[in-house]
């Protein structure tokens, strides 16, 4: 029994092993397939590589899945170099995982010619040195003179490797054992940086309970995939050709599992694909649909207990419900958070001179943080660095989302820890011995932020010919640095589709979606299910936790939605029959009929944020072609709750929503109260009655809402002053009267 303040789970591994599994016995008689891969450096998220005397080193990284082995590996470099470099002395060294692979000579270029073509060099690398995570490093050795007096940081020392350079390799599948101790590999591999694509297999269209189990599992895999993204194709009664998940009860097995032993309870099992033997199937089995949900909960909460090939989930219990805003990927709002709590690997907070890399931290904030008239987000930064030996200017620059925030001078006393505190936008002193307090302006804080700290060490020279050897300086951001949002309240104007698209709000206020109702059509299509599973994966990606407590209903089902935020998904005609009577719905789609209500200043992207514009136009038309919409409005069941509808004119058009969810750039365009999506563009509408969710202290609440009505605020201020003046006058009159009375004989 595994217990904590959140959950309890009991898993029985090994003891439960169905008897007849001969058809799925291990063994790989056929030859393992070999596949070829080709990536440009740009596809590996690496732009042009610029090497110089100041920064002679740079690298690219690539990964290898746990179920594959590299058989051949090569790179084809397209590069150019400074014509000042001497051929006999200059070259580029190429390393694979710090093992020297090749020395690439640099051929001289003539000064009196214009060079427009890149040189090309193919290099074979040793595949046996490949690991799960790999680095190819390039080091420039550049000389421009035979003279003993040479400036190694001279601007004429440079070479550039083009982003169209190519990495090629051939890989062969490995025969992995079917063991839960490896899980979630090979279904999800942390060393695979591509989008996770994991098919969900059913015998036929699943019912609501089976759909819920699959959605929970999708959100769990989405949390694992994180920034990679995830999609979950839906397959009916067909054996997949890749790693896949199969959900089946004893009465709803796919044909390829008909002879498989019946489950004796909630069961999780890994087997080899009977036709594609190097692929695996994750079986989620049960006597009924309730068992499927329990099995999925066992994966989400009790995975460390699972070993062997099969696990029978005896019990999953929730000892304490989750609290609001406790999503693992969100910055905690109940206390200050150490930088050490935000890192993904031990050396993330340090960097070395010459590496051309900075310290980066991802910070997600609750989308409804109330930043009105705040002084910003407080950060106490502690850092250390190798002290410079001269007074040459070295700096530490801080940026947020690629926007410069503040710079610090690195003084010669940097061997000790320096605490920096300041307030943006005030300029700070360069005296690093002083305590300084700084804050990130609230308007720069988005749902997802990247804090970047870049140490810039200056080159130390003594005279024209003497330059200190680089590469020895180190900069460290202390893991005891803190960031604190505990003094912020939670209050936000709704509907706000940007908060939904970027943070899943309001549903993700509770990471397990315990106060969310998801409404789906009674006979969902494959694409509707696939969109639901992709959306569930997005919730998991945002919070880092599966949607274990979300409630699922059919759109025509009687349900108490009073205390729920509602998510509607499906074909527009099925959904609008339930919601089109609500006056807050500004977009209506029914087959070829399209209707939209807009404000007078609809073309202004921030018009909605400035005022509640009244409807100025209403357009109703008939048109064909793919169209989908995401619409937000106040819940008709509870004024403090929200409804978000994801709908399409036809079921096939739901792929527009799914593609938008999977595309980070497309998702960032979802804003306002309604978003209309066609094959080429995203259009936002900002019309709708504004309402607020959350809470504020009474005084702040009054002043915040009065600030939207300056004339009323001025009148109330004047009345307040008059009342205070009258009260003070009465007090003074009373005191004067008493003084006169005491002076009389």
Question: Where are each of the predicted segments found?
Answer:
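N-terminal signal peptide c-region/cleavage motif recognized by signal peptidases
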Residues: 3-4, 10
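Solvent-exposed alpha-helical segments and adjacent loops
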Residues: 14-745
């Amino acid at each position: 029994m595994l217990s904590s303040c959140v959950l309890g789970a009991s898993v029985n591994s090994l003891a439960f092993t169905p008897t007849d599994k001969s058809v799925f016995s291990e063994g790989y008689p056929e030859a393992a397939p070999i596949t070829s891969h080709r990536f440009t450096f740009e596809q590996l998220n690496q732009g042009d590589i610029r090497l110089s005397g100041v920064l002679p080193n740079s690298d690219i990284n690539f990964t290898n899945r746990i179920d594959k082995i590299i058989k051949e590996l090569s790179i084809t470099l397209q590069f150019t170099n400074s014509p000042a470099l001497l051929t006999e002395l200059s070259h580029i060294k190429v390393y694979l995982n710090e093992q020297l692979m090749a020395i690439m000579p640099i051929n001289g270029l003539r000064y009196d010619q214009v060079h427009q073509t890149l040189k090309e060099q193919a290099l074979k690398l040793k595949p046996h040195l490949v690991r799960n995570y790999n680095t190819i490093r390039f080091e420039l050795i550049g000389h421009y003179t035979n003279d003993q007096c040479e400036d190694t940081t001279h601007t004429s020392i440079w070479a550039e490797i083009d982003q169209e350079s190519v990495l090629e390799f051939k890989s062969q599948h490995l025969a992995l054992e079917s063991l839960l101790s490896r899980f979630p590999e090979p279904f999800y591999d942390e060393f695979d940086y591509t989008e996770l694509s994991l098919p969900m297999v059913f015998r036929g269209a699943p019912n609501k309970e089976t759909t819920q189990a699959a959605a929970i599992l999708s959100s769990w895999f989405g949390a694992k995939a994180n920034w990679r993204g995830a999609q979950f194709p839906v397959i009916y009664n067909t054996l997949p050709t890749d790693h896949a998940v199969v959900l089946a009860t004893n009465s709803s097995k796919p044909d390829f599992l008909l002879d498989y032993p019946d489950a004796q309870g909630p069961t999780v099992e890994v087997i080899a694909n009977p036709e594609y033997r190097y692929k695996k199937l994750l079986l989620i089995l049960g006597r009924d649909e309730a068992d499927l949900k329990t099995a999925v909960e066992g994966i989400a909460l009790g995975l460390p207990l699972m070993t062997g090939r099969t696990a029978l989930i005896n019990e999953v219990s929730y000892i304490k419900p989750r609290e609001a805003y406790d999503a693992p990927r969100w910055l905690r709002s109940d206390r200050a958070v150490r930088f050490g709590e935000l890192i993904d690997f031990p050396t993330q907070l340090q960097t070395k001179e010459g590496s051309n890399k900075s310290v980066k931290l991802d910070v997600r904030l609750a989308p409804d943080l109330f930043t009105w008239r705040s002084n910003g987000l407080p950060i106490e930064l502690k850092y250390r660095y190798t002290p410079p030996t001269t007074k040459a200017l070295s700096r530490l620059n801080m940026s947020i989302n690629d926007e410069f925030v503040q710079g610090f001078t690195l003084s010669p006393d940097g061997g000790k820890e320096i605490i920096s505190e300041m307030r943006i936008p005030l300029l700070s002193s360069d005296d690093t011995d002083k305590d300084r307090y700084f804050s990130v302006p609230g308007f720069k804080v988005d749902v997802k932020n990247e804090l970047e700290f870049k140490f810039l060490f200056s080159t130390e020279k003594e005279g024209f010919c003497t330059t200190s050897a680089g590469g020895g300086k180190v900069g460290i951001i202390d893991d005891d640095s803190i960031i604190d949002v505990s003094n912020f309240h939670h209050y936000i104007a709704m509907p706000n589709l940007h908060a939904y698209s970027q943070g899943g709000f309001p549903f993700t206020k509770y990471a397990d979606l315990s106060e969310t109702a998801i409404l789906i059509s009674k006979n969902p299509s494959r694409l509707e299910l696939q969109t639901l599973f992709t959306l569930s994966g997005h919730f998991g990606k945002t919070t880092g936790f599966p949607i274990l407590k979300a409630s699922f209903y059919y759109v025509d089902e009687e349900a108490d939605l009073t205390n729920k935020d509602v998510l509607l998904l499906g074909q527009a005609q099925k959904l609008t029959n339930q919601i089109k009577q609500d006056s807050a719905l500004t977009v209506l789609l029914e087959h070829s009929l399209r209707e939209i209500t807009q404000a007078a200043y609809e073309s202004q992207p921030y018009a909605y944020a400035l005022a509640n514009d009244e409807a100025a136009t209403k357009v109703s038309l008939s048109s064909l072609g793919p169209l989908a919409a995401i619409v937000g409005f106040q819940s008709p069941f509870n004024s403090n709750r929200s409804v978000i509808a994801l709908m399409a004119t036809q079921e096939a058009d739901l792929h527009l929503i799914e593609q938008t969810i999977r595309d980070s750039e497309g998702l960032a365009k979802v804003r306002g109260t309604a978003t209309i999506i066609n094959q080429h563009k995203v259009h936002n509408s900002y019309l709708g009655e504004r309402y607020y969710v959350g809470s504020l202290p009474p005084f702040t609440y009054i002043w915040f809402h009065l600030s939207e009505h300056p004339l009323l605020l001025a009148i109330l201020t004047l009345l307040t002053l008059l009342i205070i003046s009258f009260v003070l006058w009465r007090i003074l009159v009373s005191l004067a009267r008493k003084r006169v009375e005491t002076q009389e004989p």
